[in-house]
Amino acid sequence: MSTKTNIQKDWEQREFIEDMSINIQKIVEFLNKFELSTRNKLSDLNEKLTILDRQVDYLEATFKTVQE
């Protein structure tokens, strides 16, 4: 009986390890997709902020020349 119990415990441990490995892989895939998505969104936001910054600089320069 002890051998059978040991074999059963071994299988349970192997199944647990396999389940953990699969779940870790899923988490890694999610994080990689999230990182890519976030990087793209931040890049788009950076471009928009750069455009807005240039527009503000232009408006400030225009306003200064009008005041003079």
Swiss-Prot record:
Entry's Gene Ontology cellular component terms: cell leading edge; cell pole; cell-cell junction; cytoskeleton; filopodium tip; pseudopodium; SCAR complex
Subcellular location(s) of the protein: Cytoplasm, Cytoskeleton
Major location category of this protein: cytoplasm
Source superkingdom: Eukaryota
MF-aspect GO terms: identical protein binding; molecular adaptor activity; protein-containing complex binding
Subunit architecture: Part of a Scar/WAVE complex containing brk1, scrA, abiA, pirA and napA. Interacts with scrA.
Family recorded in the similarity comment: Belongs to the BRK1 family.
Protein purpose: Involved in regulation of actin and microtubule organization.
Official protein name in the record: Protein BRICK1
Gene giving rise to this polypeptide: brk1
